[in-house]
């Protein structure tokens, strides 16, 4: 049975916290049951470095919850221990001994070694390469990690889109060692359409889309998660007439416009069950939207589907509903449905987030300027806010109880926003700080804010900074701002994604395929990592980034320039910071389950320069599963 993740105890701003003595919890959910998490292995990787071989592995959230800091590690090469004393300051090790070998690690608890880890994943070329099955003219748009076979190592599910009209979308699964597991052909119901605004009307089985002819579709309609608690992730996807699974079976429907939600076996690519989507908007055409996962009852993961249909002049009016589902291993059952009232002022963005904004142990669904409660009721609409392309929710201010959000506002097609951005209380929707337009703007482009980001990029100021893509540095809404201290720079770094890459706890920035570091003293950036031979995709994004192997820092998954393979990159920067794997943090892991326009990753505790200790997660494993951290 799945149990809810216990959120943090109330944080009261104090001098000790602001001095960074510890990372205080942000809210309280008294004695909430524990959420079930994936039974991950050590995620050990071996990467060539200038001195020899850099090793990195996971501290599991399950063992940190049980033992806290009383965990050390021994590192082995070909069965011989390399370290003189157990490793305690990080979960990394630099091996400078000559020759190649098979690396493993063992945890040490109370002086007793635990079982040996699986052998390290070899990044012999500085990355792990995953060859893609032949599909001429296709590119990878998104990737979803999931443990499809239950062995503790993530596999990768990818969506592949054609740049040629009348070609189906493809959904494929691969191991990190390069084995193709299966392919699902989404069929004629997913064919890429002509470009232009009309391309925002998705084909019934479309899974994402932003090709040269695909317009600006952002309908992912895929997610990957273990819903039934058997230790293996399922794949959830929109399907329609003609969708063909790995075993050759097809979806057949009375009309090509009919849409379904299919549950796919993550290991075999075969369909396990399917249900039709709600038909509320069927008269207006097919629905696009987003998929994600949320713990709506605080115990079980549920599938969240957001359905969006475009109507009216220039297809510029949206009708939106949420349908949630539960899967017990056999049946996909509707949970609740919520149709967003047209008069509510609720306005969708290009993605959703599933986050426990009120810290009661149950996840809410955030969609731009509004939040839907875990029971399918409207929680709030941010006063005065409209549509934007990016929003972020996390513990941005360690001195303030609860979670905060930052969102930007877009001006286009004659729609003029009231302000360019806003920083707000994620629980109530109250705007805490609101940006201002230039006084002398002349047209939409002068006040359109296409991107906004947040991260701890200035260690001199407690908490996170936030900034936008506003080009005019003299504009009142431009520059870098700190959540407590206001404007701290008139210039800005790149504005695509926040990433944890180097050895400190501050944020770096990911743009295209490179990582850059902001220097607050000079108000400039410098590239600290830039791989060769790979490219970014739509909106300068790679298919995925996140903590999928190694220690708590994040990896980058990029497609090769010839579109024949994916490459997974991990950092080799030394660190003195030891954190449990981010993949076993509730908000962080659920952030992987949503797509649309790819957004930055966050934890639901404060992770920044001031962090000294993070709260123990209240998590457990599925019943009957042997712990990865058990004794040998």
Question: Predicted regions span which residues?
Answer:
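Short, surface-exposed binding/anchoring microloops in extracellular/periplasmic proteins
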Residues: 49
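General nucleic-acid-binding
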Residues: 46
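Beta-propeller-forming repeat regions
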Residues: 33-43, 52, 59-66, 74-90, ...
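Secretory targeting and sorting signals
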Residues: 1-30
């Amino acid at each position: 049975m799945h149990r809810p993740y216990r959120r943090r105890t109330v944080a009261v701003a104090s001098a000790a916290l602001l001095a960074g003595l510890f990372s205080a919890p942000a809210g309280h959910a008294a004695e909430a049951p524990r959420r079930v998490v994936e039974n991950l292995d050590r995620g050990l990787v071996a990467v060539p470095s200038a001195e020899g071989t850099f090793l990195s592995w996971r501290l599991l959230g399950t063992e940190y919850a049980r033992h806290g800091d009383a965990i050390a590690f021994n590192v082995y090469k070909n069965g011989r221990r390399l370290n003189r004393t157990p490793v305690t300051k990080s979960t990394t090790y630099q091996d400078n001994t000559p020759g190649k070998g098979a690396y493993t690690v063992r945890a040490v608890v109370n002086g007793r070694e635990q079982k040996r880890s699986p052998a390290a994943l070899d990044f012999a070329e500085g990355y792990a390469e995953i060859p893609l099955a032949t599909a001429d003219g296709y590119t990878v748009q998104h990737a979803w990690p999931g443990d499809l076979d239950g062995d503790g190592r993530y596999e990768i599910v990818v969506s592949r889109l054609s740049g040629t009209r009348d070609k189906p979308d493809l959904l494929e699964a691969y191991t990190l060692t390069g084995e193709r597991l299966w392919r699902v052909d989404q069929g004629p119901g997913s064919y890429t359409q002509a470009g232009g605004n009309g391309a925002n009307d998705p084909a019934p089985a479309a899974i994402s889309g932003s090709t040269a002819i695909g317009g600006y579709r952002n309908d992912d309609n895929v997610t990957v998660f273990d819903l039934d608690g058997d230790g293996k992730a399922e794949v959830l996807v929109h399907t329609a007439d003609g969708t063909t699974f790995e075993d050759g079976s097809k979806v057949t429907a009375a009309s090509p416009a009919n849409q379904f939600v299919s549950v796919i076996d993550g290991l075999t690519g075969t369909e396990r069950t399917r249900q039709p989507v709600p038909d509320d908007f069927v008269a207006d055409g097919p629905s696009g939207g987003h998929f994600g996962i949320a713990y709506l009852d605080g115990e079980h993961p549920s599938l969240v589907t957001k359905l969006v249909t475009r109507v009216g002049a220039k297809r510029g009016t949206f009708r939106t509903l949420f349908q949630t589902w539960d899967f017990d291993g056999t049946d996909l059952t509707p949970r609740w449905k919520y149709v967003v009232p047209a008069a509510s002022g609720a306005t969708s963005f290009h993605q959703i987030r599933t986050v426990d904004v009120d810290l009661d142990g149950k996840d809410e669904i955030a969609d731009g300027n509004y939040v839907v409660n875990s029971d399918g009721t409207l929680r709030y609409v941010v006063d005065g806010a409209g549509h934007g392309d990016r929003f972020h929710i996390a513990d941005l201010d360690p001195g303030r109880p609860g979670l905060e959000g930052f969102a930007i506002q877009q001006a286009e097609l004659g729609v003029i926003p009231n302000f360019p951005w806003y920083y707000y209380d994620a629980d109530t929707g109250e705007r805490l700080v609101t940006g201002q337009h230039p006084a002398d703007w002349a047209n939409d482009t002068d006040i359109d804010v296409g991107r906004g980001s947040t991260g701890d990029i200035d260690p001199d100021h407690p908490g996170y900074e936030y900034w936008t893509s506003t080009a005019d540095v003299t504009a009142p809404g431009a520059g870098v701002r700190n959540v407590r201290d206001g404007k701290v720079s008139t210039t800005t770094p790149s504005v695509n994604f926040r990433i944890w890459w180097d050895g400190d706890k501050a944020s770096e920035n990911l743009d295209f395929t490179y990582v850059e570091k902001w220097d607050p003293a000079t108000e400039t950036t410098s590239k600290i990592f830039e791989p060769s031979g790979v490219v970014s995709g739509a909106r300068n994004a790679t298919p995925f980034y996140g903590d999928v192997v190694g220690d708590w820092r994040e990896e980058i998954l990029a497609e090769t320039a010839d579109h024949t393979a994916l490459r997974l990159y991990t950092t080799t920067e030394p660190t003195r910071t030891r954190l449990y794997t981010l993949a076993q943090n509730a908000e962080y892991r659920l952030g992987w389950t949503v797509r649309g326009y790819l957004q930055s990753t966050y934890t639901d505790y404060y992770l920044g320069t001031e962090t000294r200790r993070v709260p123990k997660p209240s998590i457990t494993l599925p019943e009957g599963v042997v712990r990865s951290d058990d004794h040998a």
